[in-house]
Design a protein with these regions (language model features):
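Extended lipid/amphipathic-ligand handling interfaces
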Residues: 45-50, 81-88, 110-114, 199-205, ...
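Short, hydrophobic/aromatic-rich segments at coil-to-beta transitions
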Residues: 54-61, 88-95, 168-175, 207-213
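Gly/Pro-enriched, hydrophobic low-complexity segments
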Residues: 170-243
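N-terminal leader/targeting segments and the immediate start of mature chains
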Residues: 2-91, 164, 234, 238-251
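A short, amphipathic edge element
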Residues: 149-160
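An acidic-aromatic
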Residues: 83-145
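Flexible, membrane-facing loop/turn or short amphipathic-helix motifs
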Residues: 66-75, 102-105, 182-192
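Generic short beta-strand segments
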Residues: 61-69, 95-100, 175-184, 216
Length: 251
């Protein structure tokens, strides 16, 4: 009986070893464990930066949580959410949901192309040059000095949190802190430059593409950016402006 029990125990041990062996297809993960070191978190932030710079195109959404943020402070236009498309290297189009001073909700389109920044009139839907002092630059998100630079050099206390499923994708959740000064060019100068803000990144384990990015502000406010549909065909033409009134050339 004792010999039989020993044989059963040995067989169970061998089976357990075989099940976790790479030879049988269950590969030991090379990813850092949750709550890993800042060095391991930075490794994945660097990979995500490379992936953004390699993008041919992507669709993304941008949402401000809590009270709306200014899209055009001079004219009192407040931003709430946007559905956008990016075509490398320098074309972005966003359908934006905004509110006016009187509380009216409007839809407008803003386009960033090499020829300039254009925006539709919420009433006529015709394009014109966007106000020069408008906040938020969609192209800046994907520029070398945008999200990629933040991922590489500006995230303090980077730490792997966990593996999580986002948009049906297996992602690695990395958190850290970034100064408002570095984040403001990306999200429209809404943060205090001298403060540090928690930023969470969800990075696709297979492609290293950023699936989601969240900036946490005080008072239950924040910014959420979600990326999807990467490297699909996207065409963002330069908007056609309406004819200028006689004697008043378009700026």
């Amino acid at each position: 009986m004792a010999r039989s029990l020993r044989r059963s125990a040995l067989a169970a041990l061998l089976l357990a070893c075989l099940l976790v062996s790479p030879v049988f297809g269950v590969k030991a993960s090379s990813l850092p464990e949750p709550n890993g070191s800042s060095d391991s978190g930075q490794v994945y932030l660097n990979k995500a930066a490379d992936a953004i710079l390699a993008l041919k195109s992507t669709r993304f959404s941008l949402k401000h949580e809590g009270t709306p943020a200014f899209l055009d402070e001079k004219n009192g236009v407040m931003f709430t959410a946007a559905d956008c498309a990016y075509s490398a290297p320098d074309r972005v189009s966003c359908d934006i949901k905004a509110s006016l001073k009187n509380g009216t909700i409007v839809q407008l389109t803003r386009v960033w192309v090499p020829e300039g920044t254009f925006q539709t009139n919420p009433l006529t839907r015709q394009f014109a040059k966007a106000p020069a002092d408008s906040n938020f630059n969609g192209v800046m998100l994907f520029a070398k000095t945008g999200i990629p630079e933040i991922l590489r050099t500006e995230v303090q206390k980077a730490q792997v949190v966990n593996r999580e499923k986002i948009q049906n994708r297996e992602t690695l959740h990395v958190k850290g802190e970034v100064s408002g000064d570095k984040l403001n060019p990306l999200i429209g100068s809404t943060l205090k430059p001298e403060l540090m803000y928690r930023v969470d990144f969800w990075i696709d384990e297979k492609s290293a593409n950023t699936a989601q990015l969240h900036v946490t502000e005080p008072d239950a406010k924040g910014w959420l950016i979600e990326l999807f549909g990467t490297d699909e065909p996207i065409d963002i033409p330069t908007p056609t402006l309406p004819p200028s009134p006689k004697g008043k050339p378009q700026a």
